[in-house]
């Protein structure tokens, strides 16, 4: 007999309580949308909904364009993972969980730029120990319907590079465009 996990009853309104341990493990916050699926065996499947994840192919193309245009590494994330990268190591970033620092920037809807080479770059993924490998960085939140749904990030490894207004505006344009695509 296979393990059944946690057993819960459905209340009068059709609600099921997801245990705190599972929510913490899967990083599901209060009010966060979930997709509900059923399979042929009658199982109900809950999946975290990522609005920008639906645009992952489009986001990949957009990241490639950003990278070619700016000459920098371009990343696009949803709230949980890196969904597109161009100009940098895909293995290191793609489908990796975002760092707590980046998650906090998203929560605060904060625009971050490492202005000087002495400024510390925000780690992108949880595995990113950020041993000074990025000398310049712009992080711009993707906002749709007033909520942050991800980020556009430009990175540079070159020691004499500084992100200026042009890079900020490019990241802002990309974030605004992706956010508006989700509102359609």
Predicted features by range, described:
Residues 56-65, 98-103, 150-184:
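Juxtadomain coupling helices with adjacent low-complexity linkers
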């Amino acid at each position: 007999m296979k393990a059944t996990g946690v057993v819960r009853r459905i209340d009068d309104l059709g609600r099921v309580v997801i245990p705190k341990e599972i929510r913490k493990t899967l990083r599901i916050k209060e009010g966060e949308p979930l997709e509900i699926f059923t399979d042929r065996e009658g199982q109900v499947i809950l999946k975290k909904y990522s609005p920008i994840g639906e645009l992952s192919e489009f986001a990949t193309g957009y990241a490639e364009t950003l990278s070619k245009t700016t000459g920098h590494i371009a990343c696009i994330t949803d709230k949980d993972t890196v969904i597109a990268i161009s100009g940098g190591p895909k293995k290191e970033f793609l489908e990796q969980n975002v760092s707590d620092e980046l998650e906090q920037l998203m929560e605060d809807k904060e625009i971050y730029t490492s202005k000087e080479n002495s400024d510390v770059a925000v780690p992108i993924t949880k595995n990113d120990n950020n041993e000074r490998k990025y000398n310049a960085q712009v992080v711009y939140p993707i906002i749709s319907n007033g909520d942050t749904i991800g980020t556009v990030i430009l990175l540079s490894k070159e020691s004499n590079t500084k992100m200026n207004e042009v890079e900020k505006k490019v990241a802002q344009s990309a974030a605004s465009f992706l956010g508006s695509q989700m509102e359609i």
